[in-house]
């Protein structure tokens, strides 16, 4: 499907046909891999009707060259989603999502957008939240039914439950989407799905295809550094972020952007408080680096 009207009509038809009580949305930019398959699989397990979207959002790319370079693999993506049991695929053109060109009004990510990924990619999260907001609106279940469109779902509302699925790998985006949904009263439950990794520990990413063999081997240092912090947290020891960072910086093909331990909800740094004393509570180790020409991000939840 390529239009919001088609999406609403077809999802309403399927909900009626299945006598469904829940609908899931899996927003993607395509170039799908096993991480996306896990998102789709989880959504199918938890909902009666599942919609996946494939849309390369121009608003979240800083440079046109990055947008042009992003891989488009629609046919393969459709096959993957079909194999996972997704009911509907929404693959709109840019003109469908932004019919008047770039929108005058956007969702702004606020102060959380200026740190970590946002510091390196100005405007990225404003663009990402704007398109997520639109996709969440398109996917509200029941709006294609006669009399549909009420901005309420769930038990007692007369409309199906509504869930949207995001990967833990994009931790800052996940945090911001959750805040947007809470602060702006979106009628949707955000479900986080754990990061999927290859057997050697590399977090799956659509960008991995651009790594040479040597660069891919070098990129493994990111997950190894995160695991060092996890081991220390599990052992109730000080985190020793400096040693983990030195491991990353010892790899000549890797240019470190940031590496820290933050509060999972506020994204404020925690590592400074854990240099001398054992780590306690919940945290999120986050890292970003350029490996050759490819920018990679990863993270790992910490608990002690």
From Swiss-Prot:
Catalytic activity: (R)-pantoate + beta-alanine + ATP = (R)-pantothenate + AMP + diphosphate + H(+)
Matches recorded under Pfam families: Pantoate_ligase
Active site: 36
UniProt superkingdom: Bacteria
EC number: 6.3.2.1
Pathway membership: Cofactor biosynthesis; (R)-pantothenate biosynthesis; (R)-pantothenate from (R)-pantoate and beta-alanine: step 1/1
InterPro entries named in the record: Pantoate_ligase, Pantoate_ligase_C, Rossmann-like_a/b/a_fold
Record's keyword terms, sorted: ATP-binding, Cytoplasm, Ligase, Nucleotide-binding, Pantothenate biosynthesis
GO biological process terms on file: pantothenate biosynthetic process
Broad class of where this protein is predominantly found: cytoplasm
GO cellular component terms given for this protein: cytosol
Gene Ontology MF term list: ATP binding; pantoate-beta-alanine ligase activity
Compartment(s): Cytoplasm
Residues annotated to bind beta-alanine: 60
Coiled coil: none
Similarity comment text for this entry: Belongs to the pantothenate synthetase family.
Protein name as catalogued: Pantothenate synthetase
Organism encoding this protein: Arthrobacter sp. (strain FB24)
Top-level taxonomy: Bacteria, Bacillati, Actinomycetota, Actinomycetes, Micrococcales
Gene designation per UniProt: panC
């Amino acid at each position: 499907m390529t239009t919001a009207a088609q999406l609403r009509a077809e999802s309403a038809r399927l909900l009626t046909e299945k006598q469904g009580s829940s609908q899931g949305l899996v927003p993607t930019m395509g170039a799908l891999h096993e991480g996306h398959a896990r998102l789709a699989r989880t959504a199918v397990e938890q909902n009666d009707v599942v919609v996946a979207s494939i849309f390369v959002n121009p608003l979240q790319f800083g440079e046109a060259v990055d947008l042009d370079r992003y891989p488009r693999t629609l046919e393969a993506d459709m096959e993957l989603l079909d194999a996972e049991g997704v009911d509907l695929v929404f693959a709109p053109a840019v003109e469908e999502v932004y019919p008047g060109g770039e929108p005058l009004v956007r969702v702004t990510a606020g102060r959380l957008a200026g740190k970590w990924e946002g510091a390196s990619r100005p405007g990225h999260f404003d663009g990402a939240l704007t398109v997520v907001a639109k996709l969440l609106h398109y996917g509200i279940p029941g709006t294609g039914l006669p009399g549909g469109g009420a901005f309420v779902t769930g038990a007692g509302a007369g409309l199906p439950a509504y869930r949207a699925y995001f990967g833990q790998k994009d931790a800052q985006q996940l945090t911001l989407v959750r805040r947007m949904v809470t602060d702006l009263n979106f009628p949707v439950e955000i479900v986080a799905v754990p990061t999927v990794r290859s057997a050697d520990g590399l977090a799956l990413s659509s960008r991995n295809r651009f790594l040479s063999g040597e660069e891919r081997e070098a990129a493994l240092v990111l997950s190894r550094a995160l695991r060092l912090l996890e081991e220390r947290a599990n052992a109730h020891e000080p985190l020793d972020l400096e040693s983990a960072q030195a491991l990353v910086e010892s790899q000549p093909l890797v240019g470190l952007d940031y590496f820290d331990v933050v509060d999972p909800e506020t994204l404020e740094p925690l590592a400074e408080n854990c240099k001398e004393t054992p780590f306690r509570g919940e945290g999120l180790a986050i890292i970003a680096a350029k490996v050759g020409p490819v920018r990679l991000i990863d993270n790992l939840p910490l608990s002690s």
